[in-house]
Amino acid sequence: MKTKAVGRLLLLALALAGFACGAQNVKITPLGSHAGELCDRDRATIFEDPTGVRILYDAGHTVTGGDDARLGTIHVVLLSHAHGDHIGDRKLKALEGGTCAAPETVSATPNSTTGEIAAAKNAVIMMIAPMAAFIGKKVENIRSKPTGACAQTGPDMVVPFPAACLAAVQLGGARTFKIANATRAVEIATVTAAHDSTVPRELLSEPERKNLDADGVSLTLGPSSGYVIQFTNGLKIYLSGDTGIHAEMKTIVSEFHKANLAMLNLGPNAVTGLSAAYAVNELIKPVAVIVSHVNEGATTDGKAKPNSRTAAFINLVKGRPVYLALSGKTMEFDGNAKCVAGC
């Protein structure tokens, strides 16, 4: 009897140890147009810290709006730049609509998917200051009340907030966020992205559109940015945003922030597969890579199509795993950027 009791206790201890280990993982869940695939318009990604802080990055076109059931709780909304496929001037008509290469979308004007989600989730709006002000105005239009700065009484912003609020930053700035009962906070820092940040005309007021049309110019909402998020388990993920390669991938992202996981945007307008692979292999040097923003229907049954640009990039990356940002598939990473589940 004593032997059986000891055995049961040992099994319980092992189970609890496994649970504790799992509880220390960061969960990363892409939200795309077609479940289990990496598709043309896919941008949105949710990050969940072990303490429960949940962050949405670049809502874009592949959510159905603030009521998308896949979102769950969102504490912080990040936006890399104001292009329509990131700020979300359109949204999914329905999940699985259209094809992976050409998802079916409808207009998200006048407020954008980013604005809709921030308002619906009472989220912190953390992004470059001109974009934060712009999204804050969209939230004001939805809620019929001004969007103020987030209250902060200590070194960290404590989430959730009772209403959407602004945590505007400049390039290079950072904020920290924690759940009320947590002992550690998640740090989010902005980093350089070599890209423009023009906002879609459809999201502007009629007078503003007319002013711009007179000279054939566009409105830019400050510089683009990427982010480095340091989670409480030690994982440091670099979110590239749309960018060409640049020296700060080495000096700031790798050497200063010491990012060990990279989520890299592809897309021929900003970066080629060859240059993106060079950035990974020679500049950022992460332990692992997640590939997103591929501007093609990159997969079939969750596998990269052999003749896709995405597959070509993966084949050029050396010495580290590359994971596809498959919609609805949650990946879990430990503090050393090892994928321990879902990859």
Language model segments and positions:
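N-terminal secretory signal peptides that target proteins for export/translocation
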Residues: 1-5
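Active-site environment of divalent metal-dependent phosphoester hydrolases
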Residues: 36-41, 63-64, 83-88, 127, ...
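Active-site-proximal segments of metal-dependent phosphoesterases and phosphodiesterases across multiple
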Residues: 261-276, 280
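Bacterial N-terminal signal peptides
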Residues: 8-18
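A cross-family glycoside hydrolase active-site/sugar-binding cleft signature
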Residues: 58, 240, 264-267, 291-293, ...
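Core dinuclear metal-dependent hydrolase active-site scaffold
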Residues: 21-70, 156-254, 332-343
